[in-house]
Amino acid sequence: MREVNVGGLQCTQAVMTVLREMVSMEEGEEIHISYEEPNARRDIMAMVKRRDYTLISEEEKLIILAK
């Protein structure tokens, strides 16, 4: 399991930080993404929809994905 905290990052920086981690994930691996900005959540979820990742859970300020 990987953990990424993008709290305090601007939307583009948050997305790029998450993407760097996601591309090196192994099949079946999970990533826990914590964020603060609602716009970061929106942009991260838009990126996830364009790629082959599974949303496991979405809670307040936490997104859990799997490859």
Question: What annotation goes with each model-predicted range?
Answer:
Residues 36, 42-56:
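Short, charge-rich amphipathic interface segments used for partner binding and complex assembly
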Residues 1-25:
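An N-terminal amphipathic alpha-helical segment
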Residues 1, 30-32, 62:
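Intrinsic-disorder/low-complexity, polar/charged segments enriched in Ser/Thr/Lys/Arg/Asp/Glu/Gln
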